[in-house]
Amino acid sequence: MFIKICGIKTPNELKIIEKYGDFTGVILECVSKRKIGVESAKNLIEISNIPVFAVSTTTEVLAWKNIIELTGTNYLQMHSNIDSKSVEAIKKEYGCFIMKSFKIPEKSEFPEIDAENIILDIERYEVDRILLDTGKGCGMVHDHRISQIIAKKFDIVLAGGLNTDNVSEIIKKVKPFGVDVSSGVENKNSKDEGLIKKFYENVKSVKL
């Protein structure tokens, strides 16, 4: 199962994540305690032995172009309402692997209806991977009844409040293609190898 451990800030964190993650990510152009500068991101991307997503909430095509050209990344993770034509233009010009986030509410009165509306939104985009999240790295769990429905139609990456205690049961319920974690493997705002190792083991223990 695809494991992405996001929000790295230092080469030391990267070294830890390379032992357990298939992908990682650097936070740029958004409000986040994990945000780093372009030069730091470029350095992490250059030295990494695993793919590094450049993660941002920007809706501006020019901002994404700057991220690509200044960091050298081939992987983008979009956490915004950027329109589908802009995504298409970026992909056509740069050929990047794009993972687009779609927001899932924390609680839903009508999960089937919410799922269908989100599916319609997803179908507007030509992207390489679909990420279902509670919203912009807030670390909150969303209504998995919705993501469970969507996961039956698409290979989704699941994010939002995942940690060592809940990831196994959530995977069994939703059956995602992969998982994306950040705050759930942190201690005092830094990536914790013990938590990352436990998270990895709990993910790999699930047989779908």
From Swiss-Prot:
The keyword Isomerase applies. Keywords: Amino-acid biosynthesis, Aromatic amino acid biosynthesis, Isomerase, Tryptophan biosynthesis. One of its GO terms (biological process) is L-tryptophan biosynthetic process. Pfam families: PRAI. CDD domains: PRAI. Belongs to the TrpF family. This is N-(5'-phosphoribosyl)anthranilate isomerase.
